[in-house]
Structures are given as structure tokens and as C-alpha cells.
């Protein structure tokens, strides 16, 4: 899930000259000097996940239970499988662009396994269709056993919007392998050796798909999702292995304490070796961190800043546990994961740990503010920042301000302190807001 070097996060040892050529994990792939073919575990794991989801789709569609009284349950399972397959292919395309694509599970004779690359537009169109189908089958979060650890209707809407925005956006294109695609070339980025930055000529159709997905979710009276009024509580709850009471988290990858997951153990607030009775520390910048430059991009009154960026480190100094401050400008800890928010059971295990203990902290793949910001982006692109969308009663600017209101507090003048003077200026405001809202979440 780690996205390597971005404008917000820094991958493990991202600027270390000695790690760029590692091939036995993804550390090399996160490095600034990276060889992109080093991302072996990510490539293998996402393909395995995607193939398993495809197998589930095939099996459910062919299941005799689809013709019984269990049909509604089976359709919900189908919606989950379609969404997970879409997620898998989306991650593959996001990382590697044009990749092999097939709608059916691998055949026993391997006749559909060794296939060539498919252009990303075709893949996007397939998974957009899958997600539209899935939305019709999936229950809302909170219905029966469907909580944030299961794929539900809200996440399918959100993933549809995310995929559509990528599909309609600019990306690197291979004009050598796919010369016949109807694409618009970027006006200011030059072509090089047949590769260019382009987007579909009908890109606005994809923005409309994204807008519809967000608006339909926001306007649905059965929609159970809200923003948690307290930004810090979002992270206290997930660290404490609790589901968010406002259903802010549309989907969490589920882990189990002592069984799986190292979120918080290899990233987050730093607890040095020997601070507890254990010889093993936790937190720090092992998987991902951020930078001092990102910290200073925040408004000082933004409540998200001191939750997202953490400088303290608890270390043994002359035999005494002391709070010190991290001074590396490229190694600021991700504060959304903190050992003192974790469960008592986990902290008791930590007291005697000699090796890493799985924290069980779920990985949040999408939160509800993403819906508001994707709505704002799509509405702005199609209609500008101030025109009101009929289903939601929101303009792009109003949607942005929903997110900023939590960050600064209702009534704060800072809520409207952004440049919305033009479509282009407002787009840049959304880019900045996404960085401040989702920092260290590696999305």
C-alpha cells in the first residue's frame, strides 16, 4: 500500500543511496533513485489479490445458490468481489499503467494467463462497469454484519469516483504500443520517444461519472456516513481497534491484534528500544514518514497538523526514558498512529516483547471527506467552483468548506481562506486540501 516518494509521504529509506537497488522487497521501489522493477512484492501480491477476486466473481455468478432464496446474500457477495477486483486492477494500473487484463479466472490449461498488455483506458472502462453493477448489490455499512471491514455501498461509490477521476485525468501514455487511442496530448509536456502525457478526448464523461457517484452518495437519505466532528478521534478509534461511531471510514483493511498488521509498529509515534521492559521499540519511520516541508505547509491553526506530524520520540538516554525531538527534516513521524492510543492488551504484550507484535490496527483505504473533495474536484471541472449541484445542494466550494470546517472549527475565518477565484485556482486549493486531510495515509 505504500506509495513511495510523493509530495506528502516518504517511503522507507527513500533518500538512502544504498537502498535503491534492493530487490527482495519494496524498499528499493520507494527510493528516490528507484528502479521501478524492484517493486516485486507489490506486483506479486496485487496480482494474487486480483486473481482471487476474479475467481470469486466467476464462482458466485455460476453458483446454484444464485437461483435460491439466498440470491440476495449471493448478490451482496458478488458486489464485494466485483469491488475488490476493481480495486486490484485500479492499483495495478495506478502503479504500472498498461497491464494484462482478463475478465475471467485463470483457466486450467493456462490459455488466458500469458497475455499481453491492455491499454489502461480499456481496463478503467471495465472496472467502472463492475463498480456500477456492484453498487446495485451492496448493502449500506451498518446493515447486518456489514461494517467498515466489509465492502459496502458507500465504498463502491467512492471507489467508482476515484477510478473515474484517474481515468479522466492526465497520465503517461505509450504511443508505441497503443498508437490508435483517441487521446488528447498535454499542451505543455513534450512527447519523448513515443511516450507522452495524455488523457481521453471525452475526459469530461469520466468527471461526470465521478460527480454522479459522489452526489448520489451524498444525497441518499439512507447514507449512514458522516464526518467525525473530531479529527483526532478518527485515529484514536482505529488505533484502539474500534470502529468509527460516525461511519467516517468507508472501508478498512481488517487486521487482528497479535495476528496481522504492523501499522503503528513500523510507522508512527516513536517508542525506542528499551523504553518499556521490552527490548523491542515501535513506531518511527520504518515504512513511511513525512517531511518538515509538509509540516510547514499547514496553517498553524489547522487541527490536522499536530495529529498528522509527530516530532517527539521516547528514547532511553543514560538509562532513563526521555522525550526527545526528531530533527531529521526528511524523517518526521506520521502521528496518526500512536502507541498510547493502542489497546491495553497490546501494550501489555509490548512490555515483554522481544520481536515485532502485530498491532491489528486496520488500514483505512477511504474516508468520507474524500467524497466531499472528489465531489468538489468533479463539480469544479464541469461547472466551476460556485455553481450549485441540484441533488446535493452543494457547490464545489461548499463541499470543500465542509472539510475545512472540521479542520478549523465552525465560524473560523480560515474555512474560507483559500483561492477560489477561478477554476484553476480552486483546483489547486483542492490539491492542497487533499494533502492536509490525507497526509501519511499513502493514498
Report residues per predicted region.
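Structural recognition of the beta-strand scaffold that forms the well-ordered cores
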Residues: 92-94, 100-102, 249-253, 365, ...
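An aromatic- and glycine-enriched ligand-binding surface/loop that stacks and positions planar moieties
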Residues: 1-24, 97-99, 103, 124, ...
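C-terminal structured "cap/appendage" subdomains that terminate the fold
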Residues: 382, 396-443
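Acidic, serine/threonine/proline-rich low-complexity intrinsically disordered regions
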Residues: 105-106, 114-117, 171-208, 362-367, ...
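Conserved, well-structured interaction surfaces
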Residues: 17-96, 111-148, 335-366, 371-374, ...
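Carbohydrate-binding/catalytic loop surfaces
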Residues: 110, 232-258, 338, 344-349, ...
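Extracellular structured ligand-interaction cores
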Residues: 76, 83, 98, 151-158, ...
Amino acid at each position: 500500500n505504500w506509495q513511495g516518494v510523493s509530495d506528502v509521504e516518504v517511503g522507507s529509506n527513500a533518500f538512502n543511496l544504498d537502498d535503491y537497488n534492493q530487490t527482495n522487497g519494496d524498499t528499493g521501489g520507494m527510493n528516490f533513485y528507484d528502479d521501478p522493477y524492484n517493486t516485486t512484492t507489490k506486483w506479486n501480491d496485487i496480482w494474487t489479490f486480483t486473481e482471487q477476486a476474479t475467481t470469486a466473481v466467476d464462482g458466485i455468478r455460476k453458483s446454484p445458490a444464485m437461483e435460491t432464496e439466498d440470491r440476495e446474500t449471493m448478490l451482496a457477495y458478488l458486489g464485494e468481489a466485483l469491488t475488490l477486483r476493481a480495486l486490484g486492477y485500479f492499483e495495478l494500473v495506478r502503479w504500472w499503467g498498461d497491464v494484462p487484463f482478463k475478465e475471467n479466472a485463470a483457466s486450467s490449461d493456462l490459455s488466458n494467463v500469458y497475455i499481453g498488455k491492455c491499454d489502461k483506458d480499456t481496463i478503467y472502462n471495465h472496472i467502472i462497469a463492475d463498480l456500477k453493477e456492484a453498487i446495485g448489490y451492496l448493502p449500506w455499512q451498518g446493515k447486518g454484519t456489514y461494517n467498515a471491514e466489509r465492502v459496502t455501498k458507500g465504498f463502491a461509490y467512492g471507489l467508482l469516483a476515484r477510478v473515474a477521476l484517474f481515468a479522466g485525468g492526465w497520465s503517461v501514455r505509450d504511443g508505441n504500443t497503443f498508437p490508435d487511442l483517441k487521446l488528447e496530448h498535454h499542451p505543455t509536456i513534450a512527447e519523448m520517444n513515443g511516450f507522452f502525457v495524455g488523457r481521453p478526448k471525452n475526459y469530461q464523461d469520466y468527471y461526470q461519472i465521478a460527480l454522479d457517484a459522489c452526489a448520489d452518495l451524498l444525497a441518499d437519505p439512507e447514507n449512514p456516513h458522516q464526518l467525525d466532528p473530531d479529527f483526532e478521534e478518527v485515529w484514536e478509534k482505529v488505533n484502539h481497534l474500534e470502529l468509527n461511531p460516525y461511519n467516517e471510514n468507508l472501508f478498512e483493511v481488517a487486521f487482528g491484534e497479535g495476528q496481522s498488521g504492523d501499522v503503528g509498529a513500523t510507522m508512527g509515534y516513536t517508542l525506542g528500544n528499551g523504553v518499556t521492559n521490552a527490548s523491542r521499540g515501535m513506531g518511527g519511520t520504518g515504512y513511511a514518514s513525512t517531511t518538515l516541508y509538509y509540516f510547514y505547509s499547514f496553517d498553524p491553526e489547522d487541527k490536522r497538523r499536530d495529529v498528522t506530524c509527530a516530532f517527539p520520540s521516547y528514547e532511553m538516554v543514560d538509562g532513563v526514558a526521555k522525550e526527545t525531538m526528531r530533527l531529521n527534516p526528511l524523517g518526521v513521524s506520521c502521528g496518526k498512529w500512536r502507541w498510547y492510543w493502542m489497546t491495553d492488551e497490546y501494550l501489555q504484550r509490548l512490555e515483554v516483547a522481544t520481536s515485532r507484535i502485530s498491532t491489528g490496527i486496520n488500514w483505512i483505504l477511504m474516508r468520507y471527506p474524500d467524497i466531499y473533495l472528489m465531489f468538489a474536484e468533479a463539480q469544479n471541472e464541469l461547472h466551476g467552483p460556485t455553481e450549485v449541484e441540484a441533488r446535493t445542494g452543494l457547490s464545489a466550494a461548499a463541499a470543500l468548506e465542509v472539510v475545512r470546517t472540521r479542520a478549523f472549527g465552525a465560524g473560523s475565518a480560515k474555512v474560507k481562506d483559500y483561492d477560489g477565484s477561478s477554476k484553476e485556482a480552486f483546483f489547486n486549493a483542492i490539491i492542497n486540501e487533499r494533502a492536509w486531510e490525507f497526509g501519511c495515509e499513502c493514498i
